[in-house]
């Protein structure tokens, strides 16, 4: 019997609910080498939804206007800061707008390489100076308030991306719970 569920209809086949990610990750449909988020502690199953995101490569379903993670390989980053600089800066402008959301927002660039590797790549393979690269990263961090995570490799970047999304989701759930409690207290006081 074929189903659209993540598991067969036999409830004994269902995964432990604690191991299923409680939110759906939106993956930009234009992402060329997307993360799959397979077996990243504490989750064994992470629901994914491929969709054209207006900003970034990863977000949370129904929170796409508030959270984004832009994934970059080392060569992607160098190309984005040199040849694709104007386009990349427009992306930062959109990420900055997202962070100003009234309910709170977060934007981050996750790089599949440590900063020292990025600097070495720039020195060896581009005409961009290391000082220019670092100046751009620092300047854009300050100007747009976008966070950067330099990770030792792709798998670590994938784990970091899931952890960022999960932490944002948890804090958002906590905020929603507090708002509901305040609302119910206000209704009780009115009665």
Regions found by a protein language model. Give the residues of each.
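Conserved catalytic cores of phosphodiester-cleaving nucleases, focusing on short active-site segments
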Residues: 67-73
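Non-catalytic C-terminal interaction segments of nucleic acid-processing enzymes
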Residues: 1-64, 76-191
